[in-house]
Amino acid sequence: MTSINITESAQEHFAKLLAQQPEGTNIRVFVVNPGTQNAECGVSYCPPEAIEANDTELKFENLSAYVDELSLPFLEDADIDYVTDKMGSQLTLKAPNAKMRKVNDDAPLFERVEYAIQTQVNPQLAGHGGHVSLMEITEAGIAIVQFGGGCNGCSMVDVTLKEGIEKELLAQFEGELTAVKDLTEHDRGEHSYY
């Protein structure tokens, strides 16, 4: 069963909005382009006639959230909150698995590392317009990654790799990974500038 957490403040916010809609209207939580780098989550009104037979209904105290079959696995562990601060109020929707489906603990090492990169590393790099891709894992347990986007040519790549990405992945995959290297560093040859 998919676990989508809608906080009490978000439920109250939705209940106020739904009170102004025709009776029987609930909400729909969905992912556009699920399983891709361009995945985006959204929430919309869901009138009774828009409920599909293969939708999953998640019941909350004052409302139901409907999720379509395709979006369901990508909304695992999603969190919807309504936050109020000095700047005002806003709805936040965090879906760590929107870009990549959750993998099992017994999945191959490559899939588990790829999942960690997509769900933990890339969201941090996205703020700088960058991302990292897992290219291969050598027999010696070295994860070879390639930086892209805003990270390409950035002077902070080495620091990001050693202090951030490598530390995080080696702690998470202790005994399975021995190092994390940048493809250009691992592949240095005649084409390299330095």
UniProtKB/Swiss-Prot annotation:
Binding-site residues, [4Fe-4S] cluster: C151, C154
Recorded GO molecular functions are: 4 iron, 4 sulfur cluster binding; iron ion binding
What Gene3D superfamilies does the record point to?
Fe-S cluster assembly (FSCA), HesB-like domain
The cofactors required by this protein are: [4Fe-4S] cluster
Q: What is the lineage of its organism?
A: Bacteria, Pseudomonadati, Pseudomonadota, Gammaproteobacteria, Vibrionales
Q: Which UniProt keywords apply?
A: 4Fe-4S, Iron, Iron-sulfur, Metal-binding
Official protein name in the record: Fe/S biogenesis protein NfuA
Query: Would you say which domain of life the source belongs to?
Result: Bacteria
Q: Which SUPFAM superfamilies match?
A: Fe-S cluster assembly (FSCA) domain-like, HesB-like domain
- Native species of this protein? Aliivibrio salmonicida (strain LFI1238)
